[in-house]
């Protein structure tokens, strides 16, 4: 499989060196994840007797991928505005607060912190 090499300028403090990143044109390496298994698991926990169509799962999966992409883009922009080379949890938290309505962002950040703590403890 042929791969192209793209050139990006790194905008970190003190580093103006170009970064070379391999770029693949394969559809399997597009970076999008499939969350259908997790969507079904959550549905069975919440409403055990109900099902969900594959089209609905595809729509929810697209929404999840889109939201993760928006959060990562906004967090990356915040990182560059602060002239930092490291993405911190605070950048992600601020990105969530910028993208989501106030109450929803508050719950998302709280549940996200709790999930990270459970992961660290296990």
Curated annotation (Swiss-Prot):
Q: Tell me a GO cellular component.
A: nucleosome
Query: What keyword terms does UniProt attach to this protein?
Result: Cytoplasm
Q: Which domain of life is it from?
A: Eukaryota
The answer on whether this UniProt entry bears the keyword Cytoplasm reads yes
Cytoplasm recorded as keyword: yes
Which SMART domains does the record associate with it? H2B (SM00427)
User: What InterPro entries does this protein map onto?
Assistant: Histone-fold (IPR009072), Histone_H2A/H2B/H3 (IPR007125), Histone_H2B (IPR000558)
Record's function text: May act as an acrosome-nuclear docking protein in sperm.
Name of the molecule in the record = Histone H2B subacrosomal variant
Taxonomic classification: Eukaryota, Metazoa, Chordata, Craniata, Vertebrata
